A protein has these predicted regions:
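Short strand-edge motifs at loop-to-beta-strand transitions and within beta-strands
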Residues: 60-64, 188-190
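Calcium-regulated, polybasic anionic-phospholipid
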Residues: 10-56, 84, 151-182
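Catalytic domains of lipid- and phosphate-ester/thioester hydrolases
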Residues: 71-75, 91-97, 103-119, 123-800
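Eukaryotic cytoplasmic intrinsically disordered
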Residues: 1, 5-9
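Long amphipathic alpha-helical scaffold regions
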Residues: 16, 68-72, 80, 88, ...
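Glycine-centered small-residue motifs that form tight turns
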Residues: 31-33, 60-62, 91-92, 119-121
Length: 800
């Protein structure tokens, strides 16, 4: 939960003394060295020493002072450069945690800047307690929200200066950093939003017209003129003199305190109140289902009801079709009403999205929904690239951009999915799905994506799980959540800065299943005859996903090559992000001084992004969201959160891993080990050498905190011989119907096959349904064990 902590202040003095360089970056001369310092938790400025020319042993003896906060993680970045006419050479980067310093004591640190040549940099530190009064910060133990204010800057005098025409006024460290100086006298003030405890830098810069997210990202273009702004108190009124060429301009400043409005980003690791209310209602439904399933004399009391989660995997159309089949089987044996959660990755989210358009879908016969989807899945997929559709995509994305959202290639993929799943435009949103859970009538849906952290040199990539429910979107790793209808809005320091229309569900589908990196590019080329403009940009960010190495089988569909509309759409994506960029609702928040002690973080690994707090997600202006299959191609992670207290996971895998059917489960187990999450101990080596089964049951009796896991891999084991549980196949037609190929290179269900024939669609639905119904007794036995374990956790004096 969000708490208040008293933050005291310290004064940090950093003196860059000297360096010893035994080798030069320059071929013909000695190095011309200088040092930069950056402490982003104290200042938005980057400080720099003078340049010492032609010296192997440069001396600076320059001191820089910072006002630092006691309760945030303060990492000083020190960079040693060699000045060069073309581009300066970075010699070394040092990251120093100032919590290693002893307050009140001067300390000289000797840093090795080149391990092979033993080059060194000497720096003197002094950390002194400030006499400033302490201040309250809001925190959840991981993130820290500093005091927030609006800053109005009067531009009357700027408007009369011709030198600033078409320029932007830039306030480093503020939100938004860049605001174009208007060419009209009507605008009297420009408003920025600031962290009152942060030193900022005000200046004038040329516009950066090529940046899609220009209003929140820091431009690489240097300031033409600048002046530092010390931290400003609430209610501050004053002026600052800004140099403009040989002239100066006085700007009036005024801050407005906004703290009384409270945070609009929920900083908490618990589930939201609305989900808790749902759980109370769902327990009644589940209790009644368990009474019927297990033949109980009465429904178990609310405290005894086990929490059962259905977990779907990725796998494109195969996963979507497969999940329909599995849900059909679960409905037939009465288990669907006993489930509390349902999660999905990639293709399985298509099934969920389709079903949750109906408020009571799990109470209705799923055969009707399956039949309706059959009509969509058996149409020619290349119809998604007709001229009319391309024009529609262009118009819709242009509308999204005008609303204020960042537009990316993933948006087009989402619109393709809209055509594929719904066959028409849908205006539904994620928050609309609240009506499907308000009475506890359906399992609670959790959609998934991951936020990619992969731009840190020398570090492994990190995929941070992001979950989407009808009530909230958030990243549990940081304990930060926003209302579903506000996802994509602009936030700073936990406060909403700009409200935007809620994103339509197709755009979210594009994020949840962005394996398009291969498939949509291939289909685009086939449909239009043109190489799409985004092809050169497809790198590991979006291509490291489950795809088939063999070429997919596509419908034959003839279109005129390189139509004008196709060119218009492909041109639309020039200079736009390839993966989904969304405004970061954690923007401006700092990390708590001991964040690295939390099991959500792997900061102990020096090659993990978690070890670099200045580069973690709160420091980013946007989230970089992709298909969760980039991390683990099955959605167990959201229901493994201890706050959800899941007792039984029914894991439904449609991942294409015929030679490694436990791949997604192995990755899940590794994730749990890294994050200290209870999970059954599984001997995968033994299982890999045993005959394959339709269902695996994993229960760790030594660890009652670990959920029971039922695992259904993508297999055809006994369905080849039985058309229904206990009913053998008879005759050539029935035997042929059982030959559903889900493992060879000739299978019609390979990931890149986006549509199926009617027969193939029905066959996969029936196979997945059979695998569930054929194992009814094992499923019921596991549910009974989950009920027993739940009851054993309840103290005897509690009344059920």
């Amino acid at each position: 939960m969000t708490t208040k902590e008293d933050v005291s202040y310290w004064t940090l003095s950093v003196t860059i003394l000297r360096a010893q360089n035994n080798h030069s970056q320059d071929y013909w001369s000695e190095s011309d060295c200088y040092v930069t310092l950056r402490l982003p938790t104290a200042s938005a400025r980057t400080y720099q020493t003078k340049i010492v020319p032609n010296s192997q042993s440069p001396e600076w003896n320059e001191t820089f002072n910072f006002r630092v906060h006691s309760h945030v993680k303060n990492i000083l970045e020190v960079k040693l450069y060699d000045d060069d006419l073309v581009s300066d050479d970075l010699i070394s980067t040092l990251l120093f945690d100032i919590s290693n310093l002893t307050p009140g004591k001067k300390e000289t640190k000797v840093f090795t800047t080149h391990p092979q040549t033993k080059d060194e940099l000497l720096v003197e530190f002094e950390l002194l307690e400030s006499e400033e009064p302490s201040h309250e910060y809001l925190t959840n133990g991981i993130l820290v929200a500093a005091p927030f204010s609006a800053l109005d800057i009067s531009i009357d005098k700027l408007l009369s200066n011709e030198k600033i025409k078409d320029m932007v006024l830039k306030l480093r460290g503020a939100y938004q950093e860049d605001i174009k100086i208007p060419n009209t006298q009507k605008a009297r003030n420009l408003r920025f939003y600031i962290n009152r405890d942060l030193e900022t830098e005000l200046g004038v810069a040329p516009p950066d017209n090529d940046n899609e997210a220009n209003d929140v990202t820091a431009s690489a273009v240097p300031l033409l003129s600048a002046v530092p702004l010390q931290p400003l108190r609430a209610g501050h009124e004053g002026k600052v003199t800004l140099p403009i060429g040989q002239d100066t301009v006085d700007l009036e400043l005024q801050t407005h305190d906004c703290m009384e409005e409270g945070l609009e980003v929920r900083l908490d690791f618990d589930i939201p109140p609305q989900e808790k209310e749902y759980l109370e209602k769902r327990k009644v439904v589940v209790g009644q289902a368990l009474q019927k399933l297990l033949g109980l004399s009465s429904p178990p009391g609310p405290k005894k009801v086990p929490v059962i989660a259905l977990v779907g995997s990725g796998g494109g159309t195969r996963a979507m079709t497969g999940l329909f089949g599995s849900l059909k089987g679960l409905q037939q044996i009465g288990v669907l009403d006993a489930a509390t959660y349902i999660t999905g990755v990639s293709g399985s989210t298509w099934t969920m999205t389709s079903l949750y358009q109906q408020a009571n879908w799990s109470q209705q016969d799923l055969n009707s929904a399956i039949s309706a989807m059959e009509g969509e899945m058996t149409k020619r997929f290349l119809s998604s690239f007709s001229i009319d559709k391309l024009q529609y995509y262009k118009d819709e994305m242009d509308k999204k951009r005008k609303e204020g959202h960042i537009v990316s290639l993933v948006d087009m993929w989402g619109l393709v999915l809209e055509h594929m799943i719904f066959g028409k435009k849908t205006t539904s949103t994620l928050s609309d799905q609240q009506r499907a859970v308000t009475e506890g009538q359906n399992p609670f849906p959790i959609y998934t994506a991951v936020n990619m952290k992969d731009g840190i040199t020398g570090c492994e990539a990190e995929a941070e799980w992001c979950e989407f429910t009808p009530y909230e979107v958030g990243i549990p790793k940081y304990g930060a959540f926003v209302r579903a209808e506000e996802f994509g809005n602009q936030f700073f320091l936990g406060h909403r800065i700009k409200k935007l229309p809620e994103i339509r569900i197709p755009y979210l589908m594009g994020i949840w299943s962005s394996f398009f990196s291969v498939s949509m590019t291939q289909l685009w080329q086939r449909a239009t005859g043109a190489q799409p403009s985004w092809t050169p940009w497809l790198g590991p960010d979006v291509s490291n996903i489950e795809v088939d190495s063999e070429p997919s089988t596509l419908d034959t569909y003839l279109l005129n090559p390189v139509t004008g509309v196709a060119k218009m759409v492909t041109d639309f994506f020039k200079n736009r992000p390839v993966i989904a960029h969304m405004y970061n609702f954690m923007c401006g928040l700092f990390l708590h001084w001991n964040y690295n002690k939390h099991s959500n973080f792997n900061a102990w690994k020096d090659t993990h992004p978690d070890a670099f707090p200045n580069r973690l997600t709160p420091a980013d202006p946007t989230l970089r969201l992709v298909d969760a299959g980039h991390a683990i191609n099955i959605g167990c992670v959201p229901v493994l959160r201890p706050e959800r207290d899941v007792d039984l996971i029914i894991s439904l895998s449609y991942s294409w891993d015929p030679d490694n059917i436990f791949k997604v489960l192995k990755r899940t187990a590794t994730y749990c080990k890294d994050h200290e999450i209870p999970f059954p101990s599984i001997d995968f080596v033994r299982l890999d050498n045993e005959p394959q089964q339709e269902l695996y049951v994993f229960e760790d009796k030594e660890n009652p905190k670990a959920p029971i896991v039922l695992y259904f891999p993508l297999l055809n084991v006994t369905y080849k011989e039985f058309k229904a549980p206990g009913v053998p196949r008879v005759g050539e037609a029935e035997i042929k119907a059982g030959e559903v190929d889900v493992r060879t290179s000739n299978s019609p269900y390979k990931t890149n096959n986006m549509t199926y024939s009617k027969e193939d669609y029905q066959a996969l639905v029936e196979l997945m349904s059979y695998n569930v119904t054929n194992n009814k007794e094992s499923i019921l036995e596991a549910i009974h064990r989950a009920l027993e374990r739940k009851e054993s956790k309840i103290p005897q004096y509690h009344d059920a």
